């Protein structure tokens, strides 16, 4: 969210950046002093749906203005548990095929706490740790409108389409 917002603000300094997603925790993230000037608003899918309903807008009746192909398939997979670490692992293997990548990805706050305690105790040295607060990842956030398995499938299809349609490969080359 923050990296994208900063990129937008760099190209368009007067832009208002709105993060729209299933994650209510992004609201807290956007309030951090280091983020406030980058992300102007955060709304969940549920909130956006309510806004559309209040205004009598049916998004399905609005014609698409085109597709965005400025993100990699790997980046679009971040919302599903394991997606962040998978993207990093794939990128490392692209540049350094012989490097072993130790990954621990966990879902849910209890599991995140456990793996962080293990890391603090030195039992996960050298590991890339991905912790998703919501079981299933961001697609299972409090502001999600559809069943989590459906959301995962949709994200996976977007990843597949992005990889296929993107002008560059997954690593920006």
PLM feature spans:
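Iron-sulfur-associated redox domains of electron-transfer enzymes in respiratory
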Residues: 1-173
């Amino acid at each position: 969210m923050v990296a994208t917002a900063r990129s937008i603000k760099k190209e368009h300094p007067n832009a208002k950046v709105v993060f729209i997603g299933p994650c209510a925790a992004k609201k807290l993230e956007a309030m951090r002093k280091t983020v406030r000037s980058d992300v102007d608003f955060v709304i969940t899918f549920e909130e956006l749906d309510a806004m559309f309903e209040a205004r009598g807008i049916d998004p399905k009746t609005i014609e698409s203005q085109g597709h965005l192909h400025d993100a990699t398939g790997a980046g679009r997979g971040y919302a599903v548990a394991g997606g962040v670490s998978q993207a990093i692992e794939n990128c490392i293997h692209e540049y350094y095929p012989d490097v072993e990548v130790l990954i621990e990805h966990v879902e849910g706050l209890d599991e995140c706490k456990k793996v962080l305690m293990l890391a603090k105790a030195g039992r996960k040295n050298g590991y890339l740790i991905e912790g998703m607060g919501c079981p299933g990842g961001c697609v299972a956030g409090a502001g999600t409108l559809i069943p989590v398995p459906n959301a995962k499938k949709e994200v996976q299809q977007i990843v597949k389409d992005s990889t296929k349609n993107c002008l560059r490969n997954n690593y920006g080359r």
